[in-house]
Amino acid sequence: VAARIAESPALRLGGVECYEGSLVGRNGDVDRAAVKALMDCVVSVAEACDQRAYFAGDEVLMTAGGSALFDLVTEGLLPSIKRQVRGVLRSGCYVAHDHGVYHQQLKAVETRLGCSASLQPALEVWAMVQSCPEPGLALLTCGKRDISYDLDLPVALYWSTRGSGPRQAVPPQWRLSALNDQHAYLTFPADSVGPAVGDLIGLGISHPCTTFDKWHWLPVIDDDYRVVDAVTTHF
């Protein structure tokens, strides 16, 4: 492909791109070996293209994308070639992070880097309790059209009783068990105090990408949950 690009009067080879995110196996040693093999291949391709003068311009772009193994690809973004190299990480989930799959995967990154609390989740979806049809079950006004569900179900985080204002953490036994198009099933111990119709439930997401694509704009709030701004999405 690189040779054909170099021969083309309409194309220019600007760099080498890869995506390591599909290699995630949630096993540190396996992940490290898989990413090393990929990046060794990427470096070899870049060096071969450089030796054959396939790159156009004075700067070569080396880029990898993914929000789980980004720390493992960085060394492979700086191959030893004649031209100047610009390494670019295309990780996107760091913008909002999450309370689910990336929260778990980040723990491995933090262990490898020797840090903690490096990213904080910043995206929540709030829903109202619409019905309590039976003990231990509440139906929320939030579903597959509103929140991500492809990797994990949302996580119940906060509870604000009707008219009270302040939020509180939900009891640890509260779980989302299923989603319909427009409803979420919140389960809790039937013999305990549960939410009532009109209460608000704050949900944490798992996988920011498939929540962003459901909203054309998002309110921005301060620490007291007052809306202070808004952002539009183009996902």
Regions found by a protein language model. Name each.
Residues 1-113:
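Active-site loop/helix belt of alpha/beta enzymes
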Residues 133-235:
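C-terminal accessory subdomain/extension
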